[in-house]
Amino acid sequence: MAIFRKRFDLKVSVYSRSSCLVALGLALPAVTSAVEFNAEFLNNEGGAPVELKYFENGNSVSPGTYSVDIHLNQIMIRREDVVFSADPDTGSVRPIIRMGLLKEIGVDIARLTRDKLIPANLENNTPLNVAELIPGASVEFDVNSLSLLVSIPQLYVQRHSRGYVDPSLWDDGVTALFSNYQANFTRNTNFGQNSDYRYLGLRNGFNLFGWRLRNDSSLSGGTGMRNKFSSNRTYVERDIRALKGTLSLGELYTSAQGDAFESVRMRGVQLQSDIGMLPDNEISYTPVVRGIAETNATVEVSQNGFVIYSTNVPPGAFEITDIYPSGSNGDLEIKIIEADGRQRSFKQSYSYLPVMTRKGNLRYGLAAGEYHNDGQPSVNLLQGSAVYGLSDRVTGFGGLLAAKKYNATNLGLGFNTPLGGLSADVTHSQSRTRRGGRNQGQSLRLLYSKTINATETSFTVVGYRYSTEGYRTLSQHIDDMSDESYLYGSSSSRQKSRIDLTVNQTLFRRSSLYLTAGETTYWNRPGSSRRVQFGFSSGIKRASYSLAVSRTQETGSFGRSDTQFTASVSIPLGGSARSSQVYANAVSSQHGDSSLNTGISGYLDEANAFNYSAQANYSKDGGNSGSVGLGWDTSKAKLSANYSQGRDNKQINLGASGSVVVHPGGVTFGQPVGETFGLVEVPEVGGVGLDGYSSVRTDGRGYAVLPYMQPYRYNWVNLDTNTLGSDTEISDSTQMAVPTRGAVVAKRFSAESGRRVQFVLSMESGGKIPFGAQAYDKEERVVGMVDNLSRLLVLWDANKDSSVQIKYHPYK
């Protein structure tokens, strides 16, 4: 079945119930220059004449409007309808490039005006001959991919960071009310006695004019329990584009930039930066590479042996600011390849910590409200924090926190050094207790990360914190103020020191070692908590296996320790991605506890909509047990059922999760949705699939919920054209969306359904319609092409009393 993406500006119209008028034009394949063809070669006896004037003029399309992919300097920018018109003198068909289109795709209009290449103050709809006005520019049309290829010298292109998305494309979505639900029912049978448990978790939302109202709540109950409804939190938020941030009001969790303070629950207002609005290379710390080129040179930047960036630079000093490293650590190798073939290389250290950001980048957070946690006193609080890139290698951060009888100040610096990424900060707190006492102290934190390329050793995070006895976090201060603490003393453990270490070592292909270790000590209790885990993982062909040992130790008055050994293996039973997997996992501890789990899991259909699992377990204390499970992913929900049985107990678990979306077009059921999601409409066409979501289909009214979209980034919504029936045609199977955070973005795809009807055409004079003539409807869309016997096959949703009128407009 053909999928059409063209819309033509011809004088045509269609009338249902009375008549249908179809205009016939001619559109023929492209040639690169004017050529004359002998039409007799294509004629057969009794067949229609062939009109080849478009071939002879070298055109690839006929005049009209086309939905095309617009590329600027080989980078896909957007999809848009572009008008193609014919020159009345030459007959050449060319795209009309508007002034507004050049602005939208990132051409530097101000510089073009300053260099007097275009007049000032042109209207957005003013057509421009780009190739003639801008030296070195060109506009080409690739009919095979329906792509408009615009080439502009880099001097006249606005410079944006990698991953930049024009904020004018941000879409707040449609007005929508939705609920994301998770329902579970569990029945346990122990020694013949049944007990049930029911749970319904809801994440509700309402979107209106860019505002997002959200509520998290749940309903639970069961045997011997009263049904209980609880609302965890309710809040409203919206983005503040000018500040590249989000404003939130209601029941919130504070967010301190640079992790200056702990996150606490409050009722109030919060304004904080949203890094999702930033380009990719501004989200995290990115290095700036500087050097000097002697000629027109190529600069390559490599990390861990892979080229991650390449660009051409003119002679002289250069500065590269849009590098996006492939990992958080690993020195960069910069190679300068001169025009005469000479090469020079040097290395630049790069280690990244989450607190670090690029030069000039500011992240901020402001919060004001009332501390709110069940069972604890409520106090007013005010908090502010910020992270700022001071230079290419130094980031500064800090914050202030004030509450009733409490205040804290944080200040720190992050460094990118040849020895690795390092940050240090100190927090000073002052608080008063309910008994009138005064606490004052400091907490020092050090973080370090480094990758040694020569040995492929990565110190992912090495952290150390030390707090003096008088230091308090806000939650510890609130605990000191509580009635229970006033009567019996504080029950919370106040941390004195903590050290954490994570090391990863690559050995060879698919094999690696890891080590994690840590120790924590406390002021108000003796002893310490220690934890160490060491592991090895590898694979043989498609099978994978791992070994690990873990030890925990609590020292002091109630000291205890335990060491566990684990081994696991997973083997696929086939070569495809949907092949079933056989797995086994064994665990043993120093106290004699041991268990063995073996099982199989996989899918039952090609679309991976039905999944299954079966498992057999052995436990030294619990004996033998087994379980089976089934899952079914539908367009409207995800369903699951599991049954397990042990020596003395049985359990049945049923689950369902999904979403209900109320929108201007009605009510649509879908799979569980994320923070930002989409709504796809193919009017009145059911069963249409979406690429990337094998189990999602449009319902009978043509709606489907697209479960996940990435905010502030290009999201391509693609219909699975293989799921369209032979009686359905769609003009464009791909659309682009850039949702704001929390938006419900609606995308409508124009589709036509009907029966295939064949017309045998002839002129009043008795002559045939030329072979290759195209037919257009009143929507200016291609509906068919005349064959060599003057027949036209179209998709037509006709009524009983409908008729069709056809006018032929030969190309001149």
Question: Which residues fall in each region the model found?
Answer:
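A short, amphipathic beta-strand motif
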Residues: 70, 289-291, 678-683, 755-764
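Short Pro-Gly-centered beta-turn/loop motif in secreted/extracellular proteins
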Residues: 88-97, 323-329, 703-725, 729, ...
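Short, acidic Ser/Thr/Gly-rich low-complexity loop/linker segments typical of extracellular
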Residues: 83, 694-703, 780-791
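Post-signal-peptide, soluble extracytosolic/periplasmic N-terminal scaffold domains
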Residues: 2-4, 10-16, 21-25, 32-283, ...
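Transmembrane beta-strands of outer-membrane beta-barrel pores
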Residues: 156, 185-189, 210, 219-223, ...
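Feature captures outer-membrane beta-barrel proteins of Gram-negative bacteria and organelles
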Residues: 168-172, 196-209, 229-242, 378-392, ...
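Extracellular beta-sheet/turn segments enriched in Thr/Pro/Gly and aliphatic residues
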Residues: 147-151, 354-357, 670, 732-754, ...
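Short, ordered, surface-exposed loop/turn motifs in non-cytosolic proteins
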Residues: 62-84, 684-693, 765-779
